[in-house]
């Protein structure tokens, strides 16, 4: 058939075959198994020109009561509609370098708590106005001396006490009251049973009564594990091991999503048994790799899975640690 084309068209086909496929749509990829089966949403979160809307990502994902999705990037916090369009952003200044976020309703308003690793503080701001209402600096009254302070994770207890993990430094977890007054700390760096080797992620484990802290011990050797601690800082148990480099935890009902920096997302049930593994990257060179440009992204394959969050329908939003900034939507298959 090529021989019947005009000479100029034949030359174009031979020299630029990619033109034939430039407009080929990307198909959804199905992943997971059983009740934890998901389809990707190609192009979700991208600009109309197909480029990333957010720039380099090393952060988190949360969702407000209206269903809007907040993700943190180097530049600031971007707010997406469920359809994947940027509807608002908080850029520069106080909103940069939010390594972890938690969103809470308090007295009829929604607030985002954030851990700013490169800026050595925790922060609380109004999710809808951006007003900063609280800062959590290193608590010198802890008596630990002049230590490095690089917070990686934050969570809030039912009584509004705040827990802030110094996961990129001393690995202490600091507890403050709702006004920001230092109360206590626990933990230390190490590979022992009750120590942390990068207490990278943390949330309240609401599957238990009373609630517990669920902590990602990302670089623990050789395990890569999750731990339970009481809200008083008492060790409870090693929850699960063998998770690679668990970066964060998000809970909906009985289920936990655990991003693994090696390029996959693990889902656990209430017994902390693995139910499904999503987005597994088969290429060792592209696992835990920040420098995978958008041109090398593969639909349904993760590279540096760093944050995740469930919406009310059980869909997942996943952020990769990535030079160009990647956030993905996974739709639960009913």
Named regions from a protein language model:
Residues 303-334:
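Blade-level signature of beta-propeller repeat domains, shared across WD40, Kelch, NHL, RCC1
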Residues 50-66, 94-108, 141-161, 191-212, ...:
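Beta-rich, blade/repeat-based domains predominating
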Residues 68-70, 111-113, 161-165, 212-214, ...:
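Conserved beta-propeller blade signature
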Residues 23-43:
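Blade/loop signatures of beta-propeller domains
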Residues 42-75, 325:
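Beta-strand-rich domains and repeat architectures in extracellular enzymes and scaffolds
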Residues 42-51, 91-94, 133-145, 181-194, ...:
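Surface-exposed loop and turn segments in beta-propeller and other repeat-based domains
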Residues 48, 74-111, 116-117, 140-142:
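Blade-loop segments of beta-propeller domains
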Residues 74, 117, 167-169, 207, ...:
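Short loop/turn segments immediately following the C-termini of beta-strands
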